[in-house]
Amino acid sequence: MSPTAQEVVEEVTELEPTPEAKKWAAEALGTFILVMSGVGTAVLAGQRVGPLGVALAFGLSLLFLVYAIGPISGCHVNPAVTLGQLLLGRLSVISAVGYVIAQLIGGFLAGIVLFAIAKNLPSYDRAVDGLGANGWGKHSPSAVRGPLGQVVIANGYGLSATIIIEVMLTALLVFVVLASTDQISDIPLAGLSIGVTLAVIHLISIPVDNTSVNPARSLAVAFYQNGAGPQVWVFVVFPLIGGVLGALVYGLLFGRSREMVS
């Protein structure tokens, strides 16, 4: 029985490689949506939904994005994930650089839009409310502040705790992404496993440093919040180290196919 025209078109479409520009556009859009949804929930609705609501916003956003743009770019939306994929040979250096640039652009655009929305609320005070930036010490969410919120009475979690949690939790995220998207696993519910992992990560680490595990997310909003800019290097360097660790653990434990499912 000869194939229908639709089947022929679908088969040819599957064989054609996706242009790099389309992958980069998908990564920019995906990172924009992730930052806008997750950080936007924290900034605009955080007091109403609490840490659980913020964690679900990040997790569900990533879950949906895996299915929306995963077939196009793999849905990294995170330089640490891109680094892990690069180390396993799943993409070239040039492609990885394009991914990271696209992710940063998408994140920065989300930060601009989010700040434009937040500052229209008369009671919004950037010095007090910030924009969902990551931080440690006096900028940790666990820091104790005075009645007006501007004076820190006691510091929150310190630098060492922040480093440990960012490395370990980013490694966990990258490991789950790699294990859920390889040819041997071929898990139809990859989006669910990845999204739930990100939600759990946020539940663990929001009280510590507001959860990064994603340099693009941290850089997107750091410079809108007083004191967050000088600390943002922590949330770039150590999630990337975590990405390397996650890729190494994946390779050592499984030694599986280095190819991602199509």
Summary of predicted features, one role per range:
Residues 1-262:
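Membrane-interface helix-loop junctions and terminal tails of multi-pass membrane proteins
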